[in-house]
Amino acid sequence: AHQQNIMNLRVSEVSQTACSMPIFYVRDGNNGQWVLTAFTSFEQGSNLFIKQGKWTALHTPTNMQTFPFFLMMSPDDPQRYTIGIDEQHEVFSTTTGQPIFETNGKASLHLSRVKTLLESDINNDIQTQAFNQHISQLGLLRPISILIQHKDGSTPSLSGLFTVDEDKLQTLSQEALFE
């Protein structure tokens, strides 16, 4: 997680997360859907909200609470969810740390807690997908590029980011907004 500079958010987390970090929309490269994301750093491989192994932001998004586990669509049935794990990440180990399963084969307390969090997150995921689709259908997303000024004078740019067009948002009727 200390190298994760972008994390997916649920719409229910936006108000709390926006107090600490910038939020943008990006397109999922696999399915083209809009994804609500928070940036923990504008540098890949960096997370400014982890200091000495501890999360320091005011709000801890669900995906940080459950990392390296995550909610995903079932490969066997796209109408169902399942739990995935990032086995390639350095925090995942088969030799050290908390076990996923007890010696009797039952889920560990840690896995049970993560499973409960992820299961309760299914409704948040469904609401977020519906919200993102609605925002897109209303034409409220506009592209934004960010130029970063480094001390050494270099100015890398971030593209592929989208934000809510506040001018368009102000012109919407309440009926359109609350459909």
For each feature predicted by the language model, list its residue ranges:
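Short linear motifs in intrinsically disordered
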Residues: 11-16, 60-62, 136-140
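Detector for Asparagine
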Residues: 5-8, 30-31, 47, 63, ...
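Short, basic/low-complexity N-terminal boundary segments at the transition from targeting/disordered tails
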Residues: 2, 43-53, 124-130
